[in-house]
Curated annotation (Swiss-Prot):
Protein source organism: Guillardia theta (Cryptophyte)
Spans traversing the lipid bilayer: none
The protein's name: Acyl carrier protein
Gene Ontology cellular component annotations, sorted alphabetically: chloroplast; cytosol; membrane
Pathway: Lipid metabolism; fatty acid biosynthesis
Function: Carrier of the growing fatty acid chain in fatty acid biosynthesis.
Gene Ontology biological process: lipid A biosynthetic process
Gene: acpP
Record flagged with keyword Chloroplast: yes
Sequence positions bearing O-(pantetheine 4'-phosphoryl)serine: S39
């Protein structure tokens, strides 16, 4: 799976989980500030991403992921390992 495929899959997950249009989920859109996610939304996002990619995101790493690009970068490293 290449980075573009990961980007599109995560973009869809974020859009569905937060109930926002995919066009709003840009690579730099902050989950909380730009997309209106609260702490529960963020936990649910992490769980959905873990399930979709069959990976585990440690709590300390999850706290550092606040936008789509950061999520894609983390997932790319995990699936490449």
């Amino acid at each position: 799976m290449n980075e573009q495929e990961i980007f599109e899959k995560v973009q869809t997950i974020i859009s569905e989980q937060l109930g926002v249009d995919k066009s709003q989920v840009t690579k730099d859109a902050n989950f909380a500030n730009d997309l209106g996610a609260d702490s529960l939304d963020t936990v649910e996002l992490v769980m959905a991403i873990e399930e979709a990619f069959n990976i585990e995101i440690p709590d300390d790493a999850a706290e550092q992921i606040s936008n789509l690009q950061q999520a894609v970068d983390f997932i790319s490293q995990k699936v490449a390992a």
